[in-house]
Curated annotation (Swiss-Prot):
Residues 48-119 are annotated as: Hydrophobic. Residues 159-177 have a biased composition (Basic and acidic residues). GO terms for cellular component: membrane; monolayer-surrounded lipid storage body. It is found in: Lipid droplet; Membrane. Pfam families: Oleosin (PF01277). This is Oleosin Bn-V. Residues 154-183 are annotated as: Disordered. It comes from Brassica napus. The chain crosses the membrane at residues 57-77, 99-119. Its main location: other. It comes from the Eukaryota. It is a multi-pass membrane protein. Belongs to the oleosin family. InterPro entries: Oleosin.
Amino acid sequence: PARTHHDITTRDQYPLISRDRDQYGMIGRDQYNMSGQNYSKSRQIAKATTAVTAGDSLLVLSSLTLVGTVIALIVATPLLVIFSPILVPALITVALLITGFLSSGAFGIAAITVFSWIYKYATGEHPQGSDKLDSARMKLGSKAQDMKDRAYYYGQQHTGEEHDRDRDHRTDRDRTRGTQHTT
């Protein structure tokens, strides 16, 4: 008889069940399903029990934390009220000092990183981002050269026009002088 896909996968996965099914018809498969259902029910019960246990223990821990916090506030509130004129400025000072030290350290690390990058770039190593810097430098250089060429070109045109005007003015002046001398 031709084997179906189900037969092939069942025989490959469960060789004893396949043998039982071949010998006893569907009995082997039915027994597998019943034991699988029992297995899956017991597994679900184990999962539920584990979840309930974990949830209960977390609930107890959160309750203990809440009770501890309330007791600490009950004890600490009178002390905080009595010592607040001293504690508040002290806490502000400590917070400012900590902020200052942390920001100073962060700026120091940033400066060291920048100097390290500049050193690598200056010594010929190619740190990350140096290709973008080189590209920007080339673009800026080409724009500067373009502006220099334009300024030179327009300067030549402007100087040439003034030169032509001066020459025309001198020629007119020379003509008028020449006519004055001849008369």
